[in-house]
Amino acid sequence: MSKKLIVSADDFGLSEAYDLGAVKAYREGVASVLSLIVSTDEAPRAVELRNRRCPEAQLALHVNYCAGRPVSDPADIPSLVDERGLFHRSSEWVQGPMGDPKCQGSVSPTFEDLLREMRAQVCRYEELVGAPPRRVEAHSVMTEEMLRAFAEVG
C-alpha cells in the first residue's frame, strides 16, 4: 500500500490575495486540497475562483471558531463570541487537557455552541459548494469539545 501526503491550503476564502496563492499552489502541485473557511465575505469568490481555475480541486471545510464573525446568529452561540458578536480569538480560550499553548485565556466555549456553529458552517458550505463536505478540519485550535462536535456532525 502506498502512502499519500495530503497538503491542505488552509484558510481558502480568507482574502483574494491568499486565495490566488492557494490556487497557484494547487495548480503547481504543492497543495492537494483547498480548505475553505465559509464564515468570510470572500468565501463565495473563493469558490468561484476554484471553479474557474481548478474545478477538479478537492475542497474541504475549514471549521472556524476563533477568527472574525460566525455563520450563526451570535445571540445563539454566546460562549463563542464577544460583545461585538465576533469570535473570541484562540489566545482568549482556556488551555484545556489537549494543551494548546496559544490558549491562555478564560473563555471556555460550550459543546452546544460549538455544535450549533459547526452545523451552520456545514450548511453554509453546502450552499456555496453545492454538496456536503467530504473532509472537515479545524482552524487554529482544537479542543475535546470540538472533537465531540466533529463526531456528532459526523
Task: Kindly give the residue locations of the regions a language model identified.
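Catalytic domains of cell-wall/extracellular-matrix polysaccharide-remodeling enzymes
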Residues: 111-112, 119-154
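Acidic (Asp/Glu)-rich catalytic clusters
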Residues: 22-28, 44-58, 75, 79-82, ...
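Structural preference for beta-strand elements that scaffold enzyme active sites
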Residues: 4-6, 31-35, 56-62, 133-137
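Active-site gating loops and adjacent loop-to-helix segments of metal-dependent hydrolytic enzymes
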Residues: 70-107
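Active-site beta-loop-alpha junctions enriched in small/polar residues
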Residues: 10-12, 37-41, 62-66, 139-141
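Short, acidic/polar
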Residues: 15-23, 114-124
